Amino acid sequence: MFDKLMNSYYYGKSGKGDYTPDDLPKNRWQLFMEMLRTRMSGLCRMNLMYFVAWLPAMIAIALCVVSLIMTLAGTVQVDETGAVLDTIDQTALREAMQTSSDMIFVTLLILIPCIAITGPFTAGLSYVTRNWARDEHAFPWADYKDAIKANWKQGLLVSTITGCVPFLVYICWRFYGDMAVGNAVWVIPQMLILMLGILWALAVTYMYPMMVTYQMNFRTIIRNSFILAVGRLPGSVGIRLLHCVPTVLFTVIFLLTLQPWVLLLLFAYSLVFGFAFSRFITASFTNAVFDKYINSRIEGAQVNRGLSQENDDDDDDDDEQEEERELKPWENGYTDKH
């Protein structure tokens, strides 16, 4: 019985027709769901390997959250019976806010090296999930390791900047906020630095998939990523918000219930599936964006990988008669790595 089950798993059911090109997904959503179903176990394995890189950062964040909760809890007043009073000691509250601000400052400073070390590993995971998202083969360990070796320099640069951005934004936000108390003009640079931080967060969506897909120097990767982040602003914002859904959901449940098991569930989700699933969503999105705005403008680059395509000789003739198009900023003669 076990042999029959395994044969059915690897070779399919008897009497069922062979898989043909007509059976390929017709759109991106079908491709995403089919590849997610097929690669579910592989994503879990990749997540366990990738989680190690984020463990120092998660420990730093967890310690900061616990410290903030304990600090703010000290401002709550109770009576002799242990009942919570509605009044709050304003002096204790101001001291707690100052202490919390210092804790956040120190945590963001610690997170710079913690996030910096994740860059090469993120590049490796981006390569594997990129292939899986477009129905191509990738070995979970071998290709992950090779992609780390091939892209570790650019990955390290991106992650180092990513680690510094929250720290710099927080410092500038506090500085310009204090200045704005006496002069409202300082609100303008305060908002500008916040917008720059948000824009970097949107551009990072494209940086890792781009560095493992195209032969570009670091400056070109940064420029193209910002162009795509602004040009595809609704999609870029949507992907970033989608990544935040699990964390926000578990946080809201925790605040409503104050049950520690909620945070344990969030940790378990991140440990088993969360990081790889987030990268898989990003890969599916960036594959579509790259096909539309980059691959379609590179001679010989294949587009719509993993999707059903109708081969028509007339289309080839029409392509030969097309007028040469002007190169866009991201083309620059670069070709697909793989």
Language model: regions and residue ranges:
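Membrane-interface helix termini and inter-helical loops of multi-pass transporters
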Residues: F175-G182
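Alpha-helical transmembrane segments of multi-pass membrane proteins
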Residues: I188-G197
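Helix-coil boundary and N-terminal low-complexity module in membrane systems
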Residues: M1-R174, W186, A203-T205, M210-T220, ...
